[in-house]
Structures are given as structure tokens and as C-alpha cells.
Amino acid sequence: MASVSAETPASHGHSFSKKTFHKPTYCHSCTDMLWGLIQQGYICEVCNFVVHDRCLKAVVSPCSSIAASLIKNPVAHCWSEQVHRKRKFCNVCRKRLDDNLSVHCEICEYFVHVECQDFAVADCKENATYLPGKDLSAVKHTHHWREGNLPSNSKCALCKKSCFSTECLSGFRCEWCGITLHAYCYKNIPQECTFGNLEPIYLPPHAVSIPRTEVPMEAIIGVQVRRKEVLAREYSCHNIGEQFDFAESEQNGAAGRLAEALRRLSLVLPRSCHGNCHASPPYVRARSISEEFNTDARYRDNGEPVQGTAHGRDPRSPKEKEEKERGDEEMIKVYDGNNSLRRRIFRVISVPRQATTEQVLTSALRAFHITKDPTDFYLTDLYASDETELCDPTPILNLNRKEGKRPAVFLRFKNKDSGEVRVYPGKLQISESFCIVPVTEATTVADSINEALEKFGLQNFNCDDYRCSEILLDRGVTERVLSWDERPWDIVKQLGKDSIRQMELMRFYLQLKQDPHGPNLALFVGNLPPNLSERSYENMLTEFLGKENRFSSIGPIYYEYGSMVIIYEDSNKAVRALYALRESKYEDKHLLVMLLPSIEPSMVPAGVQPLLVFVNVKSGGCQGLQLISSFRKLLNPYQVFDLDNGGPLPGLYVFRHIKDYKILVCGGDGTIGWVLQCLDNVGQDSECSSPACAIVPLGTGNDLARVLCWGSGYTGDEDPLNLLRDVIDAEEIILDRWTVVFHTEEKEQTQVVCNAAGAGSTSEDNTQIYVMNNYFGIGVDADLCLDFHNAREENPNKFKSRLRNKGVYVTMGLRKMVKRKPCKDLHREIRLEVDGKVVELPQVEGIIILNILSWGSGANPWGADTKEDQFYTPNHWDGMLEVVGVTGVIHLGQIQSGLRTAMRIAQGGHIKIHTYSDLPVQVDGEPWIQSPGDIVVLKSALKATMLKKSKIKRRNTEPSILPSNGEGGKSTDE
């Protein structure tokens, strides 16, 4: 095959060669089929990019071997769990994911095989780019392009033709605004991005800052897939002697690096960890063999692999491999340094037995995606006694061999006295991606900073205001701040001995010493005991942290929820506190700790109302995980919060300084009540005390969502993009809210409250106060609700389907029909007053007080208005409540089926009920048994601003984020 790399533009980095394809193959540039019998097109020998002869000079996709070097600000991906995925392509090797395990980024549309994960490019969306002192008018946001895996309805924004392909990885999509393009139209589109249709609710990255710490992004935003056993494995530590060869460390002068590694490890890992980290970056524990290069190797008792696979997986059958080894080609294991040998991690290359040293070296470099000059490297025989260098004329035949083992070689970096290093400007306002700085063994970091500042045109700035970091792009992004007297060339050479691949992925990063986030780092701490004093909370945290990790100040304390915010001015101390508190327990329950981002409100453009998204992943049908993943891709992930991590309070704290924003609550009626209750508690401390709230109904009943036209329940077929567009178009309305006061007669009797989310405040005179949004029930309705609640509490895993939940309700109702009726003659057990007048009750087994005209999953107990009706037409903002009665379980079923309505009893704005015995009650679906006493329902001073969905019909013509099943979604209005 003839190489054509010299004939094509070098900017893309591909190594193209002519190839004859024996099955239908498609061009990755124009997506047309390659026609012909032999040598139909070209293929990159590294990343498998296929291209027509006519498209060769129009290639814009960089090869995966150089893609990492093109990134100015690397951002690590947040990887999902390993799954089998259909109709997707790997962004590294460009092959289908169908038959192999793969992972994808939870923030962007980046998909890779598990075997290709080491070569994944750390180019996730940069979601926090705030720079102090930069004016909003000077901010220009650019597109963030992702190649391939486009939605099926994608059309090119330039030529308006379809740019979707099922045959290959092709086309581009902006991760911010969602526009899609052909590869050949990619260069002709303006680079400035305005976030597309979602601009009115998008939290712009230039308004967000996160502390400059080593805490991974997934730990900040609360990605669910990396918790429990995964986190336990990542932060577990073993014997440090297993990973360090101390004799070698002393010989190489690495004792200082070992001490630095241990010091840094104490900053990142919990106190319970006592062990190993690398002698070179990244300074975390050594990854296991299965985690490193994923060679799919099998091991004998002595630990030697029987076989390995090259990058991209070898599709040949065992028989074909055996025939090839007997033929003219040799399979050779390649280790890229001492670390790979120590962990027995290798790559396999296939070369002709008569290959020259140059050919073998080229194949070895290509296997590890090394793009540096081949003359800087050499190969040595692993099994030779003195590690002999390979030389012509027959290097393969001269290799030493061991019985039962393949020949193996070391890929080594030549020991030079001088060289060049790349210095990247990071977030400095520089147009160049990097500069080349010549270094020698005597060059220090301070010298390199001065040289880099001069090349970037910043020679007039003070060198002392800057720092230089060592950045590794191996399986994420790892940073180590360098001291001024360290020598960059020594770092490069030491890294070359340990791992050529790590040396290739290492870069020096110039940045200001001052953290753009500012001196204050906020930690949210939850799962503390509720209703303690500030001094008690302070003493408790000091005991957990110790005096050395004590916080600088205390932020808001949410006494009712047992949560608070603590402030640090030292980032290292904050990280130590984060992990120390995560290891701490109170009453056998781990504390919940989150490092919170910060939002600069002055950087939010006028007319933009950022959307704060809350998702309850445990609600009703449990579609929350799918939704939260889609919203993190469509929006800034720092505006999307999982209610399983601290509830609504962390998100409300982060948004407290924004003057105008909206809220989207994804959950059931109980979740909406939870968010509104938290808003009541923090509203007085926020710039926006009553943000408008929209709903994605995930619960079983979803009565408030029905009234506000958000639907009966999210099914998973709706396009998340259309849900967000509905929020933008929704109209604001006012929802009346009501205070329900319970005062029991027997002070010594304990009240049972079943759900903390609906818990009201309790005073010393045995009075409890709740806020009602939807309805309040006494009698048979509440009794049925209580039975369902108790069953779900006993076994929550059985109540993950909305349909099953409704089936359980029906089953329990049928049982109530044949059992003793606990609420019989309810009209004799209570006295009802409406607006100061006693109302005579008919013979009922339950009464329901309605604020909205939806109850029990969409039923309307009040019914339609008639001309001779003595009552006013009700709505949810008129300051009136409707009181209806039900005669039994059969009547409840008839109401839910639409055959009957409830008995209209009264209508008013102030209701008082006196109960003479223990009765089941429920407020907004949260039930318990209430002792005898007085119940007063009065209008609350707290009103909620809600968003009502506008009935707009849309055509499903815009590309969308695909659900996890890989299939396109439908419009919400279809």
C-alpha cells in the first residue's frame, strides 16, 4: 500500500494509505459509498478514517493521534457505566459499538469502546469559564463541535440537506446550540455560538466558576454512575511497596517526587487511604490491569499474559491469527516504559519477519499514538540480559525468545541533553494554542515561564503572578503545580522512562496564580441532625474535621433539614475537608457533602432567565436518570441538580444571587411540594424570592402537572429538547397555597408523620403546620393513601412503575371494600366550619378539600358547572377551597373512572375541622394517623408562581439529544 501522507494537508495528522475494501464502505467525509474493484479509497492506519480520492484534500477531522495536542483547555469526560449500545460509532477508532462494551460521556455526545478509552480525547464541554475583570460585552462564545453520532433528523445548517449517516462516523454537531453540519460545510459556518433555541434559559459558561481543585467534575455535579462500589474501588489503597521500586527511585533521584506524590495524595484521598500512588503523574492509585490499556489479556499463574490485543480490537478469528503467525508476519508485544512492564500492560503489533528496524519502530509508535519524531525513539529487546537495542538487518529474527511467550520489546526515549517542550496558555487571553520553548537540563520552570511569556507577547507582565503546571491527559485531566526550581526537561525524560504514552500526553500549562473562582469555596453538608443550634453544628463539624481542617466561616444553616454551608479560603484544606466529611457518619449514616460552583450574576446577559433543573430520579416511573442525562447534555450541567444529592437546597444556594430565573421540577406532586417548601425557607435570602416553576411529571398522580397542562406523566418518548422549549414558551400563573394547622388535644400522644419531605414545623404546644398546594383529605381517601405509602416504604424497589403503582391502588381499594370500614360514619366523627359557619355533613366516609381541580391521577371530584349551581366556578388562584364528600371506596372508584362526581359540600376561604377520634389524614399525598383535635385550613401568605404550558403544536424538525436506548424521541405534542 502506498502512503500518501506527503501529498495531503498535514494539519489533520492522518497517515493515509491506499486500500482495497472487500465489503461496502463509506467515505467519512462525504458519506458516499466507495465504488470500484480494487484500491477504492484511502484509510488512516491509526484511526481508520476512510476517504475518497476526491475528498482527500477536504478532510477536516483530525486523527486521534494528534487530537489531544490541538486542545487548548483540556476538560475530562464524565464516563458512564459500561454498556452495549446500538447504532453508535466510536469517536476514537470510528468503528461501530454494536458488539462491544462501550462508555459515553454524561455531559457530551462522546462514545468510545472500552478498549479505546485510553485514547479518548479530553475535549468535553468547558462549562465554567468565568474570568474576573472580563466585561460581558467582550465575551464571544464559540461552537464546540463533536463529530458523528448525529440525531436521525439532522439537517445541515448551511446547505439544509440531511447530514445524518447510519454507515459511518460523519458530520458535526455543536454541543452548545445543537446545530449540525456536513464535514465539507464545517469550515464555512461562523464560529460564534449563541446557544440556539435554548439561549433564553441557558446558564452561560462565562458566568460560572468552579474552584481550582482536584475534585473531579462528576463529584461536583453528582453523576450517579460513579458512586458506591466504583468510588470505593477508585479510592482504595494497597501496599505502597507494590507500586514503587525504591532502589530505582533512589537511582533516578526520584525521592523528592515520591514525597510530593504522598503529599498530594493526602489532599485528594480520604483519611482511610494509606497507600499507593504513581511515582509520576497522575498522583492517584495505580490502575488495575483491566483498567489500564484493556488488552483483554488472560494470565497464567506467573502473571504473564497469554495474549493481548492491539488498539481497535483484532477482528481476526483465532484460526486466522494462528495462520498469520505461521506465515510471514510476527506478533510482538510492545511495552512503552517501566510502568507498563511493572503492570504487565502492552500493545501487540504485527510486522513482517523481514521488517527493518524503522518499520518496527513506526508500527510501535503508531500503536501508542505517538506523533513525535521517530528519530527520538529506539527499541530494545525485553528478554535480552542487557536490554540490547534492535538494529538492522534482521531485528525481528534476532529477538530473544522464551518458551510459551511472544517476543517483546521496549519502546524507549533517547536520552538527550536538550529538547523542546510545549507550553499552553490555558485561560490566558492568547490566540495561539501553544508555544515551543527550548529547554536543557539546566533550564528551570522559572526560565520556562519567562520564555513562554515573551513568546505569548506578555513580557511586560510580572512573572511572579504566574505559575506553571504539569498536565497529564491520561484517562482524564490531572494537574500538578510545579515549583520554580524544578527542571522541565528532567520531568520529560523521567516520564519517558516510565511511559512514552504518558510523556506524549503531558503538557506544561501556564496560568495565573490567582484562582478565578475567588478565595471562597463553599461546601454543602447534609444528613446532619435537624433543629440544632449553630454552636452545636459548629462543634459537631469541628469534631469530624479536626482543627487543622476547620472552615473559615459558616454560611446559611437550614435547621429544619439538618443542612448547612461552610466556607473555606484555602482550596487544599477544602478538599481535605470534603473527603474527611464524606467518611464521617452520624447515627450510622454518612454525611452528604458537595463542593458547590459559583455564579457571577453580572455575566448573565439581559433577557436570559437561567433554568434551574431539579430531577427526582426515584419518582414514579423512575425515568429521572434518562432525563437528567439528557438535560446535562442540552444545558450547562451546573444548572442541573439531582434531588438525591442534598435535595433542592444546593441548587437554590448556587442560584441565590441571580435576579431572575426559572425552575423546572422533574418529579411527582410530592417533589414539587418539596421544592416549593425549600423556596419558602430560602426565598428571603435570595435575589429572586419566587421564581416561576415548570413541571415534568414523573410521579404516579401528577395532579398539579395535569392542571398546568404538563401532561399526565412523562413516558420517555418525549424529546427533552421540546420539553425545554415548552418551558421557554410557558405562561406564568399564580397558585394559591394554604396553611394547614394541626392542634391535638392530648399533648402526651405522639403524632406519626410518615414522610420528612412533607414534615411541617412543630411547636411546644403540640401544634404542627403544613403547607398545602393540591388537596387535603380525611377518611377513606387518606386511609387508602396510607396503606399504599406503608407498602412502598416496606419495599420501595417494587414501586418503580407508574402503571404498577396504580394497580396497587386498585388492589388495596378492593380489599377495603370487603374489610371493616374504619371511616364509617365519618360525619359523626368530625365537625366542619367554613368561613365561620357550621356545615352539616351528609353521610360520608371521607371528605376532600380541593385547591386544584385534579385529584387521584386526574379525576375531577367537583365536576362540571351547571346553570343552577349555587357555587362559584372554581380555579386555583381565586382564594377559595372546595369541600367535597365521598361515600366509600366504590364512590372513589367511580370518581376516578369519570362515572360520578363527589358530593359538593361547601366552598370558602377559611376552614376549621374538629375531630373526635384518631383518623387518617393526608396533605398532598403524604398520609398519617391524626389524633383528635382541631384542624384549621387558612390562606397562606406564600403564593407560588407556576408556569402553565402553552398549547403549541410543533413539527419535530430539529436534531435532539437521543435517549439512552439510542433511538430518536418524539415531539411532546404528538
Label the model's feature ranges.
Residues 3-11, 68-73, 133-139, 333-343, ...:
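Surface-exposed beta-strand-to-loop junctions
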Residues 1-319, 328-338, 345-347, 530, ...:
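Cys/His-rich zinc-coordinating "finger" modules and their low-complexity flanking regions
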Residues 42-49, 60-69, 103-111, 121-130, ...:
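Short amphipathic alpha-helical segments embedded in low-complexity Lys/Glu-rich regions
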Residues 207, 215-450, 454-517:
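Intrinsically disordered, proline/Ser/Thr-rich N-terminal regulatory segments
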Residues 153, 157, 203, 207, ...:
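ATP/NTP phosphate-donor binding region
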Residues 237, 241, 247, 579, ...:
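ATP/nucleoside-binding phosphotransfer catalytic cores, i.e., glycine-rich phosphate-binding loops
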Residues 6, 16-18, 31-35, 41-43, ...:
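Beta-strand elements of modular eukaryotic interaction domains
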Residues 607, 612-629, 634-661, 671-854:
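Catalytic core of DAGKc-family lipid kinases
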